[in-house]
Every structure is written in structure tokens, then in C-alpha cells.
Amino acid sequence: MSNNQTLFERAQRTIPGGVNSPVRAFRSVGGTPRFVARAQGAYFWDADGKRYIDYIGSWGPMIVGHVHPDVLAAVQRVLADGFSFGAPTEAEIEIAEEICKLVPSIEQVRMVSSGTEATMSALRLARGFTGRSRIVKFEGCYHGHADSLLVKAGSGLLTFGNPTSAGVPADVAKHTTVLEYNNVAALEEAFAAFGGEIAAVIVEPVAGNMNLVRGTPEFLNALRALTAKHGAVLIFDEVMCGFRVALGGAQQHYGITPDLTCLGKVIGGGMPAAAFGGRGDIMSHLAPLGGVYQAGTLSGNPVAVAAGLATLRLIQAPGFHDALADKTRRLADGLAAEARAAGVPFSADAIGGMFGLYFTEQVPASFADVTKSDIERFNRFFHLMLDAGVYFAPSAYEAGFVSSAHDDATLDATLDAARRAFAALRA
């Protein structure tokens, strides 16, 4: 029995399903999860000592690769001064200033410890600001595991064939209206029917939790216009795409200014950190200034802030995002070319440092399109690549991530492995 198998059996005795986040369990793809022993750059090593090229990067945070020396040094510097204080620090001001500089729509920002906290708090704030209750979200967009957002939420729920989580009361779900992603007509109909009831519309401008699906400019511009017309708050959930598709996030890429933005992953540099922020007149409704309560014992944790600040400074290097986008596009185009050469129905897309792999002829534009993927073929491809030392997301419904540590050698090795994998799929 391998060390990975031994650890998984042991984990299942004390941890539900053996993992602390469902997609890690390999339930969708089958087989034994890889237990990570260490990581460096674009690679990680499992409990059996096997090395993998890593294309999940902790689900997005590791944009500069694992254990970047600048990030490591920043963390080591603050550790000697204390891990957590429950009182403000200068570093919290520094990261807030950095975020506001990089994302101009954010006039003020509040740090939290997870993307779920960020979206949950942003929705509460939008409701407090507008005095309304109804929330609009979109099929397949995952905004964390707060009850009102676990309705047709994609990602792990889609992986397990359950579009809406058990345990979400009907009285909570009734305040959430779910529309089709990229469907402008449905959006216009919803606002015509009950626009005055809508507190907020929350959207992933680049969705990464039903695989990678881009919001169309027409759709996102319609969102901006309709929310402004009806006095609803437009929330961009950029927990995944923030600082990845561009230095200023998807809102910079599309040239659209939301009212509130949720951030995470990259801003923690691999540590538990997230944030929400936006217009000053909305943020002023947060306690202690206003009546919308939000708090967190570990919010603005000094160790997480140190890792996040170091990462944010690294990604501001000239040409960083152009180089990252070029690598990611090379990977996506190369995989599509190998599949085409093997005669395997397949498509791929990339934006910034995110990519999507689809066992369909066309790149999907909606949740419904994503569900047409050939799951059995994806699962076989996943294991062929895993055996070859390439670690893609263990689900057909998750985006992938490239870091600045991925170089020509890692991309070449990935495409060589893919050539063999696609040939085996065709055989």
C-alpha cells in the first residue's frame, strides 16, 4: 500500500471524507488523493516522494510559485514578533493601501480570513446599504459556502451532482434569484419584474468554479447599467480572478467598475486572507462607523498580511502579467493542438494566469454548456496526466492556474505528457 493510501485511510477515521475541502477527495475522478509533503516553485512532492507539475497552485493563491524566497523571507521576519494580536498593526494599513492602489474601484477595504467571509460580508453590507433583501446570482458561480449563496453554485456541488446544498433553509434560499450566466435577456427580465427589490447582484466576472467561463462584455456591461439604474449594488467576486487575469483584476480587463469587490487567494500569498471593499459611501455602513456588523478574530492576521504584501509587490514587476498570460495561453493552445492531432474532441481557453480544459468541441459560455463535457474522458485524461507527473484539478468543473514559476521546461513536459495521454484516449 502506498503512503498516500495509508494516509487517506487514516484521515477518513477522523476527518469527514478524509479531507477538509470536498474536491480534494478525488470522488469525482476516482482513485487516491495525493497527500502533499512539500512544494517548491511549480512543483510539489507527494507522500510517496513523487514530483508533480502543479496546475492548481492551492486553487489560485500561488501566483509566484510555491515558497518564493521573497514571500518566505517576509513571513519569517514577522514570525519572531508574534503570530496574532487581536489589535491593529501598521501592516494592515499597508496592505489596504496596496489594494486600493491596484484596484481603483476600492476606496476602502476590510480584511477577512476567507473568500466565504468576504462574499457573505459584502452581501450583508449591500442589504444594509439598500434596505432590500433579494440577491441575484448566476448558475455555476460559486461564492463560498454561505447559505444564501449555495444555490446552483457549481464547483464542488457540481462535482458531486448536487446543484444546491442540503441544509439551506427554504426561507433563506427564497431571497436568492438565480439566472443563467451570460444571458442578458434573462437579466433584463428579472430587473423589469422586481428590480426595486434587488439589494445586490454578485457575479464572478471570470468564473472559475464551473471550470473557466468568461463573462461576455455585453453581459457585464448590462449588469453595470441595470444595477445602477435600479439602485442595486454590483458585487464583483474576484476571489479567484483578482490579480490573476490582470494586475487590477477582471474589472481592469473589462473596463467595468463594480460597487463592491471581493478578493482572496492571491492577497494572502498562500495564507488564509481575503478582503472586500469598494465605494466609500457603502463601506461607511460597516461597524464601527455604521450599523452593519462584521468582525473576525484573525482578520488582518500579521503573518497572512506579510505573505500577501510580498506577493502583491512581486506581481507589480514590469511585464509580470504579460509573461504569465503568454505562458498560460501557450499551455491552453498546446493542449488543444495535441488533442486535435489525436482526434479527441477537446477545447481550451486561457485568460491571464487562469485556464480551462473542456472535453467538448466548443469553449463553454454557461453552466449548461459546461455540463455537456465528457466526464468519463476527462477522468481518464486526469489519471493519465497524474501518472505522468502532471497535477490538474481533480474535477472537470474547476479552472487551472499557472504561476510565474512555470517555465518552458515545465510547459514542454506537460505538453509531451498530454500528447501521450490524448493518444491513449483515442486508442
UniProtKB/Swiss-Prot annotation:
Q: What GO cellular component is one of the record's annotations?
A: cytoplasm
What keywords sit in the KW lines?
Cytoplasm, Isomerase, Porphyrin biosynthesis, Pyridoxal phosphate
Query: Which superkingdom does the taxonomy of this entry point to?
Result: Bacteria
Record has Isomerase as a keyword: yes
Which GO terms fall under molecular function for this chain's record?
A: glutamate-1-semialdehyde 2,1-aminomutase activity; pyridoxal phosphate binding; transaminase activity
The lineage is: Bacteria, Pseudomonadati, Pseudomonadota, Betaproteobacteria, Burkholderiales
* Xref: Pfam families: Aminotran_3
Q: What does it catalyze?
A: (S)-4-amino-5-oxopentanoate = 5-aminolevulinate
Give all N6-(pyridoxal phosphate)lysine modified positions.
K265
Similarity remark:
Belongs to the class-III pyridoxal-phosphate-dependent aminotransferase family. HemL subfamily.
Judged by the first EC level, this protein's enzyme class is isomerase
Tell me the compartments it is located in: Cytoplasm
Question: Would I find Metal-binding among this entry's keywords?
Answer: no
Question: What GO terms describe the biological role, i.e. biological process, of this protein?
Answer: protoporphyrinogen IX biosynthetic process
| Cofactor(s) needed for function | pyridoxal 5'-phosphate
Task: Name the EC number(s).
Answer: 5.4.3.8
* Subunit structure comment from the entry: Homodimer.
**UniProt-recorded name of the protein:** Glutamate-1-semialdehyde 2,1-aminomutase
**Pathway the protein contributes to:** Porphyrin-containing compound metabolism; protoporphyrin-IX biosynthesis; 5-aminolevulinate from L-glutamyl-tRNA(Glu): step 2/2
